[in-house]
Amino acid sequence: MRRRSSSLQLAGGSVIVIYAYLVANLTSVVESFEPLIQLPRSGSFRNRPRYERVVNVRNYGAKGDGLSDDTQAFEDAWKIACSLPLRTSIVIPSGYTYLVRPIDFAGPCRSRVTLRICGIVIAPSNPDVWDGLDTQKWLYFHGVNRLTVEGGGTIDGRGQEWWSQSCKINKTNVLLSLLHESPCRHAPTAITFHRCKNLKFKNLMVKNSQQMHIGFTNCVRVIASFLKVFAPPFSPNTDGIHISASTRVEVKDSIIRTGDDCISIVSNSSGIKIRNIVCGPGHGISIGSLGKSNSWAQVHDVRVDGAFLSNTQNGVRVKTWQGGRGFASNIIFQNVRMENVSNPIIINQYYCDSVLPCANQA
């Protein structure tokens, strides 16, 4: 094991300090990751607690024909489940496709809630549905403790129209944005968990998100496992799992193939464990970016143990903006295998994701 440290001293005393452990113990067989392909069966209720109230969205008016708006049925089912004093499951049955507009699942709830997504949940394909709404949200959970989301089903962001409008794809939008005529708009994260504690998110497929697929922000004690996260390699900013300002997050036994970072970990996050991950295509596993706009940033105690990265732009990466302040420390990457990776290990302390050169802030 080698300890590698790097620091950047900037004008005005700004500094980002990075400490990372790079462990070159690479696995030699891809077969060790094959069990990840076989996720638990959809709709399995063998582990259902003995005493549990079941709320079925079909009983609240969800048609599941992929055309009718089922948002109200989902909202009503959530309100009932969240208000009950006993453990409750919301069931989204298999065999149906549910069209759901941007929706908030607000806590706190009176007891434990399990959301079992056994069918297919799809987003509106037209970005205009978000007019007047927060364009960064689609399925948004906030302030919920002891929540489990599982079920073997699929969450489909249908983000193709959003991708075509992205400034990374549509260069005309970049020019118009510079002229303040058509600013580049944010796109939704498919499913966001904000200020949730004791969260379990498992056994689901999340695909074709408008932008990021899964976001954990300001969360504590999270286990994300047995996930499949898929988007085309050309889809812009479609990070698989994005962890921000969260502590004690474990991501394991999952396959992530997207157009951006498979997993990204940004400021004020700590106690992050990542293991048994298949990544690629995509941009690898990233710490950052950190310190944009001269901000303070810190990430510490991150361990990546067991990953196979193939056909990715980067392998394991730490990226910080010039002018930023703070630190990234105790970062460990071990038992990582890479194939056809352009930049296997990269520490970039002058990160810039702008189409135009970034102004010198040092």
Please place each PLM-identified region on the residue numbering.
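Extracellular/periplasmic carbohydrate-active domains that bind, remodel
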Residues: R2-A362
